[in-house]
A protein has these predicted regions:
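Active-site hotspot residues in diverse enzymes, especially metal/ion-binding acidic/histidine motifs
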Residues: 1-183
Length: 183
Protein backbone atom coordinates (compact mmCIF):
# COMPACT_ATOMS: atom_id res chain seq x y z
CA UNK A 1 0.00 0.00 0.00
CA UNK A 2 1.29 3.46 -0.84
CA UNK A 3 2.16 5.61 2.13
CA UNK A 4 0.25 8.83 2.71
CA UNK A 5 3.48 10.74 2.09
CA UNK A 6 3.88 9.06 -1.28
CA UNK A 7 0.31 9.99 -2.24
CA UNK A 8 0.72 13.57 -1.02
CA UNK A 9 4.02 13.97 -2.89
CA UNK A 10 2.45 12.70 -6.12
CA UNK A 11 -0.48 15.09 -5.77
CA UNK A 12 1.84 18.04 -5.04
CA UNK A 13 4.02 17.19 -8.03
CA UNK A 14 1.01 16.97 -10.36
CA UNK A 15 -0.55 20.21 -9.11
CA UNK A 16 2.75 22.01 -9.60
CA UNK A 17 3.34 20.52 -13.06
CA UNK A 18 -0.13 21.32 -14.43
CA UNK A 19 -0.81 24.40 -12.27
CA UNK A 20 -4.26 23.03 -11.54
CA UNK A 21 -6.30 20.98 -9.09
CA UNK A 22 -8.90 20.22 -11.75
CA UNK A 23 -8.75 16.48 -12.50
CA UNK A 24 -10.08 16.99 -16.04
CA UNK A 25 -7.34 19.52 -16.88
CA UNK A 26 -4.72 17.23 -15.38
CA UNK A 27 -5.99 14.22 -17.35
CA UNK A 28 -5.83 16.28 -20.55
CA UNK A 29 -2.27 17.29 -19.75
CA UNK A 30 -1.28 13.70 -19.02
CA UNK A 31 -2.89 12.38 -22.19
CA UNK A 32 -5.50 10.35 -20.31
CA UNK A 33 -8.63 9.88 -22.39
CA UNK A 34 -11.91 10.52 -20.60
CA UNK A 35 -15.03 8.92 -21.96
CA UNK A 36 -18.62 9.13 -20.76
CA UNK A 37 -20.76 6.05 -21.08
CA UNK A 38 -24.03 4.92 -19.58
CA UNK A 39 -22.78 2.34 -17.10
CA UNK A 40 -26.16 1.70 -15.53
CA UNK A 41 -26.58 2.02 -11.80
CA UNK A 42 -23.98 -0.45 -10.53
CA UNK A 43 -20.77 1.15 -11.82
CA UNK A 44 -19.73 4.79 -11.44
CA UNK A 45 -16.36 4.90 -13.21
CA UNK A 46 -13.24 2.89 -13.96
CA UNK A 47 -9.68 3.27 -15.18
CA UNK A 48 -7.97 1.00 -17.68
CA UNK A 49 -4.81 0.92 -19.75
CA UNK A 50 -4.98 -0.49 -23.27
CA UNK A 51 -2.61 -0.26 -26.23
CA UNK A 52 -0.40 2.19 -24.34
CA UNK A 53 -3.36 4.52 -23.82
CA UNK A 54 -4.66 5.48 -20.37
CA UNK A 55 -8.44 5.70 -20.21
CA UNK A 56 -11.02 6.78 -17.67
CA UNK A 57 -14.66 5.93 -18.25
CA UNK A 58 -17.21 7.87 -16.20
CA UNK A 59 -20.88 7.04 -15.95
CA UNK A 60 -22.77 9.54 -18.11
CA UNK A 61 -25.61 9.48 -15.57
CA UNK A 62 -23.44 11.25 -12.97
CA UNK A 63 -23.81 14.97 -12.26
CA UNK A 64 -20.96 17.35 -13.06
CA UNK A 65 -19.93 17.61 -9.40
CA UNK A 66 -19.87 13.84 -8.98
CA UNK A 67 -17.95 13.44 -12.26
CA UNK A 68 -15.20 15.69 -10.88
CA UNK A 69 -14.81 13.48 -7.82
CA UNK A 70 -14.94 10.27 -9.88
CA UNK A 71 -12.35 11.65 -12.29
CA UNK A 72 -10.03 12.55 -9.40
CA UNK A 73 -10.47 9.06 -7.92
CA UNK A 74 -9.71 7.33 -11.24
CA UNK A 75 -6.79 9.71 -11.85
CA UNK A 76 -5.48 8.43 -8.53
CA UNK A 77 -5.54 4.91 -9.96
CA UNK A 78 -3.76 6.09 -13.11
CA UNK A 79 -0.99 7.79 -11.13
CA UNK A 80 -0.62 5.38 -8.21
CA UNK A 81 -1.60 2.07 -9.78
CA UNK A 82 -0.90 2.49 -13.48
CA UNK A 83 1.53 -0.43 -13.61
CA UNK A 84 -0.95 -2.68 -11.86
CA UNK A 85 -3.64 -1.80 -14.41
CA UNK A 86 -1.22 -2.41 -17.28
CA UNK A 87 -0.33 -5.86 -15.94
CA UNK A 88 -3.82 -7.04 -15.04
CA UNK A 89 -6.10 -5.04 -17.25
CA UNK A 90 -9.50 -4.06 -15.97
CA UNK A 91 -11.04 -6.55 -13.61
CA UNK A 92 -14.50 -6.35 -12.14
CA UNK A 93 -13.82 -5.98 -8.46
CA UNK A 94 -15.66 -4.22 -5.71
CA UNK A 95 -14.87 -0.72 -6.92
CA UNK A 96 -14.42 1.83 -4.16
CA UNK A 97 -14.26 -0.93 -1.51
CA UNK A 98 -12.06 0.44 1.26
CA UNK A 99 -10.89 -3.03 2.26
CA UNK A 100 -8.98 -3.02 -1.02
CA UNK A 101 -5.88 -0.84 -0.47
CA UNK A 102 -5.89 0.60 -3.98
CA UNK A 103 -9.41 2.01 -3.49
CA UNK A 104 -8.46 3.62 -0.18
CA UNK A 105 -5.39 5.17 -1.84
CA UNK A 106 -7.43 6.48 -4.78
CA UNK A 107 -9.86 8.14 -2.35
CA UNK A 108 -6.97 9.72 -0.43
CA UNK A 109 -5.51 10.95 -3.75
CA UNK A 110 -8.87 12.46 -4.77
CA UNK A 111 -9.33 14.23 -1.43
CA UNK A 112 -5.80 15.66 -1.51
CA UNK A 113 -6.18 16.80 -5.13
CA UNK A 114 -9.60 18.41 -4.89
CA UNK A 115 -9.36 20.01 -1.42
CA UNK A 116 -6.40 22.30 -0.78
CA UNK A 117 -5.01 22.54 2.74
CA UNK A 118 -5.31 26.33 2.57
CA UNK A 119 -8.98 26.33 1.56
CA UNK A 120 -9.83 23.82 4.27
CA UNK A 121 -7.94 25.68 7.01
CA UNK A 122 -9.56 28.97 6.00
CA UNK A 123 -13.02 27.43 6.32
CA UNK A 124 -12.17 25.67 9.59
CA UNK A 125 -11.08 29.00 11.08
CA UNK A 126 -14.42 30.64 10.26
CA UNK A 127 -16.88 30.61 13.12
CA UNK A 128 -20.17 28.79 12.88
CA UNK A 129 -19.00 26.47 10.11
CA UNK A 130 -20.12 22.89 10.50
CA UNK A 131 -18.40 19.92 8.94
CA UNK A 132 -21.28 19.54 6.49
CA UNK A 133 -21.42 23.23 5.56
CA UNK A 134 -17.67 23.09 4.83
CA UNK A 135 -18.22 20.04 2.60
CA UNK A 136 -20.96 21.88 0.75
CA UNK A 137 -18.84 25.01 0.34
CA UNK A 138 -15.97 22.90 -1.05
CA UNK A 139 -18.41 21.11 -3.40
CA UNK A 140 -17.50 17.67 -2.07
CA UNK A 141 -19.49 15.00 -0.27
CA UNK A 142 -18.89 14.61 3.47
CA UNK A 143 -17.06 11.34 2.84
CA UNK A 144 -14.36 13.03 0.77
CA UNK A 145 -13.96 15.72 3.43
CA UNK A 146 -13.50 12.94 6.01
CA UNK A 147 -10.63 11.59 3.89
CA UNK A 148 -9.07 15.07 3.79
CA UNK A 149 -9.34 15.27 7.58
CA UNK A 150 -7.43 11.96 7.79
CA UNK A 151 -4.74 13.42 5.53
CA UNK A 152 -4.50 16.55 7.67
CA UNK A 153 -4.11 14.36 10.77
CA UNK A 154 -1.26 12.51 9.05
CA UNK A 155 0.34 15.91 8.40
CA UNK A 156 0.29 16.60 12.15
CA UNK A 157 -2.88 18.69 12.45
CA UNK A 158 -5.37 17.29 14.93
CA UNK A 159 -8.70 17.70 13.18
CA UNK A 160 -11.47 15.38 14.27
CA UNK A 161 -14.15 14.47 11.81
CA UNK A 162 -17.66 14.13 13.20
CA UNK A 163 -18.35 11.81 10.30
CA UNK A 164 -16.66 8.61 9.19
CA UNK A 165 -16.82 7.69 5.53
CA UNK A 166 -18.51 4.38 4.90
CA UNK A 167 -16.40 1.84 3.09
CA UNK A 168 -18.55 1.86 -0.02
CA UNK A 169 -19.63 5.51 -0.25
CA UNK A 170 -18.69 5.89 -3.93
CA UNK A 171 -20.46 2.68 -4.78
CA UNK A 172 -23.80 4.07 -3.62
CA UNK A 173 -25.88 6.77 -5.25
CA UNK A 174 -24.19 10.10 -4.70
CA UNK A 175 -26.73 12.89 -4.80
CA UNK A 176 -25.60 16.31 -5.88
CA UNK A 177 -26.90 17.68 -2.59
CA UNK A 178 -23.38 18.62 -1.50
CA UNK A 179 -23.52 21.51 -3.97
CA UNK A 180 -26.45 21.67 -6.31
CA UNK A 181 -25.00 24.66 -8.16
CA UNK A 182 -22.50 22.31 -9.88
CA UNK A 183 -24.99 20.29 -11.90
Amino acid sequence: MSSNGFINNNVERIIKKFDSRDPFDICAGMGIRIRYKDLGTALKAYYFYQSRIKNIVINARSSRAVRRMLCAHELGHAVLHGELAAMRGFQEIELFDMSIPTEYEANMFAAELIISDEDLMELLNEQDKSFFSIAKELSVPAELLDFKFRIMNNKGLCIESPYTAQADFLKKDIPCCFNCTMQ
